[in-house]
């Protein structure tokens, strides 16, 4: 990788050289933590702290001025929200809108409702923004309406769907009659006779099946949200399912797409899925998560990768760690070998049953399992506050059969490393490189995000340990841990 030192104050400098830790004896006060987002704090979610970035707004009404004060808000009280929703925000430690919420909420809450395509970094409040919009549009004035689906949120995985349900439960805890339903694959295939709830959160295939079987009535839906929209619209199968679900919904439904990344081709697709939408975007150079020390290790071959991981085990358990691999088979093999050698690890892939997946992620959130081996099923949206390290055991890549050169998957890399260093904390991401092709893919990532990824010499494990421990200690000190 590039050997030049980044200029002081540059993006690369901020990422590869996190600030010195705050004194452990001076933990942050609640007032200094305006929000939690991703998972609610009650679920072990992370506090929201924002880096310096600019939110760009493009209005569907080209004659309107996006800088008009009407399209920005500084206080939740200025939005005319139900006092019970404000009470829920207060219970979640929401003191003022995040930067993305300042611009998104006036656009989301306007009447008549307009579509929105929103791009924002992980941990900047996008989950709370679309949940707030949904809660403000619900009519819970009768028992019948409370049991009638009025809002639908689609997520790519059951883990993210369950996390979103938790946010709705906490934010909407003071709304009488709020009923939330989850539409994710059932282990036994058993389904309820009818979805009697006001908000449905689920995965596209299950939702489509429920609507077709009339388990879920869709004709009263007012809002459709796609979280991690780029993943669902770009992924074969999920994109088709999303389109089919939308075709079954009322034509005047408000469509909201939120994600941390929108590649150009997906953005074009999203514009068709949510026509005449207001847009909120960031430049991709601004998307690399600030506060994550990005490192890479040279490994001679696949076996050396595994031995390197074993050597890192003691550091992996300082906080919590996620190890990302390419395939389910790799996850199972690594787990099997590490457990046989006496290490405590867990794995989570799309190949295991839903209830078992739920149990694994719940144990990880609670800290009972500190090292989690997974595929890209957990790369997006999942917020666990204790994660201090992410390992890219395999560099994320776009599979292009017949291609002469392997292509790094920039968006997946961003989402993966975003599982640590969330909301102002300092985290570590380590990528394993075992051949020239993997090194070139990491180089592609560095160029795309205009950042620096630092090489660590695995011949000197004392140095490796010192660098990583110092960064993790910095993260814990910022949280006031002792």
Swiss-Prot record:
It is a peripheral membrane protein. It comes from the Eukaryota. It is found in: Cytoplasm; Nucleus, Nuclear pore complex; Nucleus membrane. Residues 107-280 form the Helicase ATP-binding domain. GO terms for cellular component: cellular bud tip; cytoplasmic stress granule; nuclear membrane; nuclear pore cytoplasmic filaments. Residues 1-49 are annotated as: Disordered. Keywords: ATP-binding, Cytoplasm, Helicase, Hydrolase, Membrane, mRNA transport, Nuclear pore complex, Nucleotide-binding, Nucleus, Protein transport, RNA-binding, Translocation, Transport. The keyword Nucleus applies. GO terms for molecular function: ATP binding; ATP hydrolysis activity; inositol hexakisphosphate binding; RNA binding; RNA helicase activity. It is an enzyme of class 3 (hydrolase). Coiled coil: none annotated. InterPro entries: DEAD/DEAH_box_helicase_dom (IPR011545), Helicase_ATP-bd (IPR014001), Helicase_C-like (IPR001650), P-loop_NTPase (IPR027417), RNA-helicase_DEAD-box_CS (IPR000629), RNA_helicase_DEAD_Q_motif (IPR014014). Its EC number is 3.6.4.13. One of its GO terms (biological process) is protein transport. Residues 291-464 form the Helicase C-terminal domain. The Q motif is unique to and characteristic of the DEAD box family of RNA helicases and controls ATP binding and hydrolysis. PANTHER family: ATP-DEPENDENT RNA HELICASE DBP3. This is ATP-dependent RNA helicase dbp5.
């Amino acid at each position: 990788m590039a050997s030049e030192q980044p200029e002081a104050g540059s993006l690369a400098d901020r990422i590869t050289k996190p600030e010195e830790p705050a004194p452990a004896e001076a933990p942050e006060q609640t007032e200094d933590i305006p929000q939690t987002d991703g998972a609610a704090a009650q679920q072990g979610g992370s506090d929201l702290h924002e880096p310096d970035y600019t939110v760009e707004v493009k209005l569907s009404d080209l004659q309107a001025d996006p800088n008009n004060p009407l399209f920005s808000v500084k206080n939740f009280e200025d939005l005319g929200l139900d006092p019970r929703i404000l009470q829920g925000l207060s219970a979640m430690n929401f003191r003022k809108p995040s930067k993305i919420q300042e611009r998104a909420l006036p656009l989301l809450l306007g009447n008549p409702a307009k579509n929105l395509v929103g791009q924002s970094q992980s941990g900047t409040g996008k989950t709370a923004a679309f949940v707030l919009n949904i809660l403000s549009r619900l009519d819970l004035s009768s028992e019948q309406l409370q049991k009638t689906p009025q809002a639908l949120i689609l997520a790519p995985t059951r883990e993210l769907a369950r996390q979103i349900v938790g946010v709705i439960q906490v934010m909407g805890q003071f709304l009488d009659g709020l009923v939330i339903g989850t539409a994710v694959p059932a282990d036994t295939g058993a389904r309820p006779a009818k979805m009697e709830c006001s908000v449905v959160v689920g995965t596209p295939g299950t939702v489509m099946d429920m609507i077709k079987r009339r388990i879920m009535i869709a004709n009263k839906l007012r809002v459709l949200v796609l979280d991690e929209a780029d993943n669902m619209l770009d992924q074969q199968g999920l994109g088709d399912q999303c389109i089919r679900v939308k075709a079954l919904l009322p034509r005047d439904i408000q469509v909201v797409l939120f994600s941390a990344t929108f590649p150009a081709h997906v953005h074009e697709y999203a514009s068709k899925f949510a026509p005449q939408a207001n847009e909120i975007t960031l430049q991709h150079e601004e998307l690399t998560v600030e506060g994550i020390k990005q490192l890479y290790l040279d490994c001679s071959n696949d076996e050396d990768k595994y031995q390197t991981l074993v050597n890192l085990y003691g550091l992996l358990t300082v906080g919590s760690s996620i190890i990302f691999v390419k395939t389910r088979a790799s996850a199972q093999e690594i787990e099997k070998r590490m457990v046989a050698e006496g290490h405590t690890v867990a794995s989570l892939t799309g190949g295991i049953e839903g209830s078992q997946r739920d149990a694994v992620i719940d144990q990880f959130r609670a800290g009972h399992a500190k090292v989690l081996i997974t595929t890209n099923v957990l790369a997006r949206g999942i917020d666990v506050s204790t994660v201090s390290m992410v390992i890219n055991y395999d560099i994320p890549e776009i599979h292009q059969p017949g291609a002469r050169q392997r292509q790094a998957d920039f968006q997946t890399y961003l989402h993966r490393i975003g599982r640590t260093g969330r909301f102002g904390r300092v985290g570590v991401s380590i990528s394993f490189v075992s051949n020239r092709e993997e090194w070139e893919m990491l180089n592609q990532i560095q160029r795309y995000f205009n950042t620096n990824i630092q090489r660590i010499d695995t011949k000197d494990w004392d140095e490796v340990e010192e660098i990583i421990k110092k960064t993790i200690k910095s993260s814990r000190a910022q949280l006031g841990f002792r």
